[in-house]
């Protein structure tokens, strides 16, 4: 049974984060749903917490929302910044902004979990990107930030195993239409992989469920991409489809 356990999900007000939070509630978890804006909606049955992930105090703010709830046994670092830059258009501002949200905030949240974890087991799931297994230089700052998060996954797993905290990553392929991507392109590219099956948010939830139950798995990255990485594409999928 997973009752009397709390899960914290960052970026839980929209897209995949909202799907994860709702699924966890349905599976019996007490869920703290982080959002960036006070007007952001969250899944029914969750506890909403508003925090700016670029703020160094974000970890404490988010975990304070779980202070009177059951012990935190799951942290899903889902929130991510995804904005364009690339070689020839590289932006120091974009780099810093991506690193703050996609790498530093997860580190702060993991550190806060470490400070507050007293006994029992806990799991951190960092959401990565399947492009790390078949990289291309599009969305450069975003990609670099996800590489950093992948490194954090192993470092934290090594450091926190003696405390009973497991740290793993899940790296999904395209699940929902990206910003700037046409609906036509998404439909064409979603199932453009060797298995011929587009990755869905439910597949991501299944991977998280597996990691919750796999008590001896830590420091691993699960790529869920229907073999998309085998295609070895040189551009982001939205550009390939429009070529």
Where are these regions (language model features)?
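Conserved glycine-rich cofactor-binding loop
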Residues: 13
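Conserved NAD(P)H cofactor-binding loop of Rossmann-fold oxidoreductase domains
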Residues: 78-84, 227
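Catalytic loop of short-chain dehydrogenase/reductase
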Residues: 123-148, 153-162, 174
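C-terminal substrate-recognition "lid" of short-chain dehydrogenase/reductases
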Residues: 201-224, 229-230
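Short, small/polar-rich loop/turn modules that mediate ligand/substrate recognition or access, typified
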Residues: 161, 166, 218-220
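Conserved glycine-rich Rossmann-like NAD(P)H-binding loop of the short-chain dehydrogenase/reductase
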Residues: 27-41
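Substrate-binding pocket helix/loop in short-chain dehydrogenase/reductase
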Residues: 86-87, 91-96, 189
């Amino acid at each position: 049974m997973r009752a009397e356990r709390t899960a914290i999900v960052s970026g839980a007000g929209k897209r995949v984060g909202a799907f994860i939070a709702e699924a966890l509630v349905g599976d019996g978890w007490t869920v703290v749903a982080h959002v960036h804006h006070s007007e952001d909606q969250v899944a029914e049955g969750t506890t909403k917490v508003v925090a700016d992930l670029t703020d160094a105090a974000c970890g404490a703010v988010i975990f304070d929302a779980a202070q009177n709830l059951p012990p935190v046994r799951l942290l899903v670092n889902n929130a991510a910044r995804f904005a364009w830059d690339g070689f020839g258009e590289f932006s120091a501002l974009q780099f810093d902004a991506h690193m703050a949200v996609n790498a530093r905030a997860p580190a702060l949240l993991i550190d806060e979990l470490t400070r507050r974890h007293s006994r029992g087991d806990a799991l951190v799931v960092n959401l990565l990107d399947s492009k790390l297994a078949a990289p291309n230089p599009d969305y450069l700052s975003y990609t670099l930030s996800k590489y950093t998060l992948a490194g954090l996954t192993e470092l934290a797993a090594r450091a926190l195993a003696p405390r009973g905290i497991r740290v793993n990553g899940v790296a999904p392929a395209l699940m929902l239409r990206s910003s700037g991507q046409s609906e036509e392109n998404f439909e064409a590219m979603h199932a453009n992989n060797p298995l011929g099956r587009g990755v869905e948010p439910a597949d991501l939830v299944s991977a998280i469920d597996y990691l919750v139950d796999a008590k001896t798995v830590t420091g691993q990255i699960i790529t869920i991409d229907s073999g998309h990485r085998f295609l070895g594409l040189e551009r982001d999928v939205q550009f390939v489809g429009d070529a």
